Amino acid sequence: MTVIALAAGKGTRMKSPLPKVLHPVAGRPMIEKVIQASKQAGAAEVRVIVGHGQNLVRQVVEPMGVACYVQDEQLGTAHAVRCAKPETIEGVVVIMNGDHPLIEASDIKDFVRIFRDEKCDLAVVTAVLKNPGEFGRIVRHKGDLAAIVEAKDASAEALKIREINTGIYIVKASVLSEYLPQISNNNAKKEYYITDLIALCIQDKCRVQAIQSTPKVAVGVNNQLELARATRLLFKRKALRLMEDGVLMIDPRTVYVEESVEIGAGTVIYPNVFIRGRTKIGSFTVIESNAFISDCEIGDSVQIRGGSYLESSKLHNKVSAGPYARLRPETEIFEEAHVGNFVEMKKVKFGKKSKAGHLTYLGDAEIGEEVNVGCGTITCNYAADKKKYKTKIGNRVFVGSDTQFVAPIEVGDDAIIGSGSTITKNVPAKALAVARGKQFIKENYSAKTAETEEKEQV
């Protein structure tokens, strides 16, 4: 089986400089969804027709192992298929649009199976819609496919038909090679339409069939509203699958999980959560409202409190983060550690059972086990030379509130750092380090100040 994906159009109704097929649907370009479904369905080869913005399209699709064929002028769907050199293909050919992101591998497999079982020469996939709109109508005679009539050319009677052409075709390569050159552009737009292939095959009494499918396969994307609808449907599909696998969603309508995300059974997700990228989440984890998680690895029984923002980080089992924690790339939080509210970390290894409860920034740091990091602690990792330096803190260290570590610096095991300190030198194990201005007291100072001010006013 070979798939030809049509992706050369400008997509002018998108009103965007980005080629239409590259617009993201639930996190990935829609053409990528079509290619992925084709490969999962067993396609030996996928040929993508490119044209408008072809360099950008190639950057996305060629790493997926597909071949690109150029349609320099957009002269219709049949012309696009010609550009794929069908005479070099053998077996079964599936033709579909690159802007149908809801197509699944199981759909393609079913279409090809029916095509083969019915010994078809050509088949068109159809669907019955409540509002057929501008879709081409399927005209049947005694149940068999008789013609496809475009909406703009249809009579009032034909417009009442609700069965439509989805734009997906399955055809023998030999039939495609024979009849494709016979398609003319004798129409108002002077374009070559793939639907004319049906008429030619019916005329020559080829075995032509209409395979009726579900409305989802008809969901194409031509404007931003349709893009949003397709995205919503994909998020809904993902949410349903996760819930079937044992994930609890308080309100799945407001949970947005991209297809690439993996989540274990028993995990609870509150409303208004977005999880994307290559994220993997274990079992019995709780993710509270307004959390954003991207490309993270999260273990079992983790607590992610509301408003937390996590990206490219790893959280081991029984970690708690937030509310309003921010974990930036290359951060790793080990078992049973706690990252509290308004704590930000970047490039940090935060040890087992360590705690940073509030209002803290740790960057380019290695923090040992069972460390207590007091409120307002900062690792000063960025120097005037525009280089970043590392802070290393050993096990069981107590860091008092409002401490600054001026990197590069190391603190040994079991050390104590006094509150309000600016630490600029290494601290040995078990040592006490205090670096702050000496406190002094002036007795009755406020009373004397008030008396002076009163005299000045007189």
UniProtKB/Swiss-Prot annotation:
The active site is at 358 (proton acceptor). Mg(2+) binds at residues 99, 222. Pathway: Nucleotide-sugar biosynthesis; UDP-N-acetyl-alpha-D-glucosamine biosynthesis; N-acetyl-alpha-D-glucosamine 1-phosphate from alpha-D-glucosamine 6-phosphate (route II): step 2/2; Nucleotide-sugar biosynthesis; UDP-N-acetyl-alpha-D-glucosamine biosynthesis; UDP-N-acetyl-alpha-D-glucosamine from N-acetyl-alpha-D-glucosamine 1-phosphate: step 1/1; Bacterial outer membrane biogenesis; LPS lipid A biosynthesis. Coiled coil: none annotated. CDD domains: GT2_GlmU_N_bac, LbH_GlmU_C. GO terms for molecular function: glucosamine-1-phosphate N-acetyltransferase activity; magnesium ion binding; UDP-N-acetylglucosamine diphosphorylase activity. GO terms for biological process: cell morphogenesis; cell wall organization; lipid A biosynthetic process; peptidoglycan biosynthetic process; regulation of cell shape; UDP-N-acetylglucosamine biosynthetic process. Keywords: Acyltransferase, Cell shape, Cell wall biogenesis/degradation, Cytoplasm, Magnesium, Metal-binding, Multifunctional enzyme, Nucleotidyltransferase, Peptidoglycan synthesis, Repeat, Transferase. Residues 246-458 are annotated as: N-acetyltransferase. It is an enzyme of class 2 (transferase). Acetyl-CoA binds at residues 381-382, 401, 419, 436. InterPro entries: Bifunctional_GlmU, GlmU-like, GlmU_C_LbH, Hexapep, MobA-like_NTP_Trfase, Nucleotide-diphossugar_trans, Trimer_LpxA-like_sf. Residues 225-245 are annotated as: Linker. One of its GO terms (cellular component) is cytoplasm. Its EC number is 2.7.7.23, 2.3.1.157. It catalyses: alpha-D-glucosamine 1-phosphate + acetyl-CoA = N-acetyl-alpha-D-glucosamine 1-phosphate + CoA + H(+); N-acetyl-alpha-D-glucosamine 1-phosphate + UTP + H(+) = UDP-N-acetyl-alpha-D-glucosamine + diphosphate. UDP-N-acetyl-alpha-D-glucosamine binds at residues 6-9, 20, 71, 76-77, 136, 150, 165, 222, 328, 346, 361, 372. It is found in: Cytoplasm. Binds 1 Mg(2+) ion per subunit. Residues 1-224 are annotated as: Pyrophosphorylase. Homotrimer. NCBIfam families: glmU (TIGR01173). Catalyzes the last two sequential reactions in the de novo biosynthetic pathway for UDP-N-acetylglucosamine (UDP-GlcNAc). The C-terminal domain catalyzes the transfer of acetyl group from acetyl coenzyme A to glucosamine-1-phosphate (GlcN-1-P) to produce N-acetylglucosamine-1-phosphate (GlcNAc-1-P), which is converted into UDP-GlcNAc by the transfer of uridine 5-monophosphate (from uridine 5-triphosphate), a reaction catalyzed by the N-terminal domain. In the N-terminal section; belongs to the N-acetylglucosamine-1-phosphate uridyltransferase family. In the C-terminal section; belongs to the transferase hexapeptide repeat family. This is Bifunctional protein GlmU.
